[in-house]
A protein has these predicted regions:
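Conserved NTP-binding catalytic cores of kinases and kinase-like/nucleotidyltransferase enzymes
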Residues: 1-66, 183-185, 276-282
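An alpha-helical support segment within catalytic cores of ATP-dependent transferases
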Residues: 3-9, 113-173, 183, 233
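A conserved alpha-helical element in kinase catalytic cores
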Residues: 5, 38-78, 86-111, 220
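Active-site acidic catalytic loop and adjacent metal/ATP-binding pocket
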Residues: 24, 29-34, 69, 155-202
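Short Gly/Ser/Thr- and Asp/Glu-enriched loop/turn motifs at secondary-structure junctions
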Residues: 25-26, 72-74, 247
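A glycine-centered beta->alpha junction motif in the catalytic cores
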Residues: 47, 75-97, 113-117, 132-142, ...
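Active-site Asp-x-Gly
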Residues: 183-229, 236-239, 263-273, 278
Length: 282
């Protein structure tokens, strides 16, 4: 695999990128520059994890609702730079949540028009069932930050939904307000997928629990139902299943936070969403 810094140098050289600026995150090196006349972003992931195959996932959507991919390999992707790159979260945080939800639904709709993958290619990606193993890991860990009864409820619901899925496809897997950016030429587009195989109802879970820094904005039954009506109207999905996925994924998201080393209590945004959904689950 090599050191991340060396891999950055290799990708810059092999993909012909003239670097203009660079930033580092906990997980990645992100370089802004040009390839010929095209403004590009080069993202190099530090080590294998959720985003290791983000280039392959994005490329599979063929630019339908996503940033276009020019090159990719494991742990690195070269894609078009979105300008100005305003995150969808900015609309929601300005009090335009209904508009932001409609945009999120539109992006999901465009992504669902991507070419179908063969069964062999689908098997190459993690499935919703694979991600659900987090429930058992948590129950076996001895951690008690999340109530065991809540984890067990989430686990039962999650795997019931997995067992009854229809029309599974490649999904973004983390389609929330910070992973949808505005481009003046192409509109709102998704970036930074994790890639998971599941039904379309699975895709809205991340959007229900964001923008995560303002849980009071989304963690209420009224807001959840309002957002669900928008998704149902635009995507023709099954609202009861989408709501159930939203609950189960919220619990799983809190589990992932624990696994990532974060303290989790009742104020955790994902748990607050789970609490808001539970009374309206059918």
């Amino acid at each position: 695999m090599g050191q991340p810094e060396k891999r950055v140098e290799e990708r810059v050289r092999d993909w012909g990128v003239v670097v203009q600026d660079m930033m580092e995150t906990q997980t990645s090196f992100i370089l802004f520059g040009k390839r010929g006349n095209q403004s590009v972003v080069l993202k190099v992931i530090r080590q294998p994890g959720d985003e290791w195959r983000c280039g392959e996932v994005l490329a599979a959507f063929d630019g339908r609702g996503t940033a276009r991919v020019f090159e990719y390999t494991e742990g690195a992707v070269l894609l078009e730079r979105l300008n100005p790159g305003t995150p969808l979260a900015s609309l929601a945080l300005e009090g335009r949540d209904e508009e932001a939800t409609e945009i999120l639904a539109d992006v999901i709709g465009r992504m669902s028009q991507a070419p179908e993958l063969s069964p062999e290619r689908l098997k190459a990606f993690a499935s919703a069932q694979d991600w659900g193993k987090g429930f058992q890991r948590y129950l076996a860990s001895g951690d008690n930050q999340i109530p065991r009864s809540l984890v067990e409820q989430g686990q039962r619901l999650y795997f019931d939904l997995c067992a009854s899925q229809r029309d599974v496809r490649l999904l973004h897997g983390d389609l929330q307000h910070y992973n949808v950016l505005f481009d003046s030429d192409r509109g709102w587009l998704a970036i930074d997928p994790k890639g998971v195989i599941g039904a379309i109802e699975y895709e809205i879970g991340a959007g229900l629990r964001n923008p995560c820094e303002k849980p009071e904005m989304f963690a209420s039954p009224v807001t959840v139902e309002k957002r669900l009506k928008c998704f149902e109207s635009k995507l023709k999905l099954e609202p009861d299943r989408a709501l159930a996925w939203g609950f189960a994924q919220a619990v799983l998201s809190a589990i992932w936070s624990v696994e990532d080393g974060f303290a989790v209590d009742a104020g955790n945004p994902s748990l607050r969403l789970a609490d808001a959904i539970w009374p309206i689950l059918k």
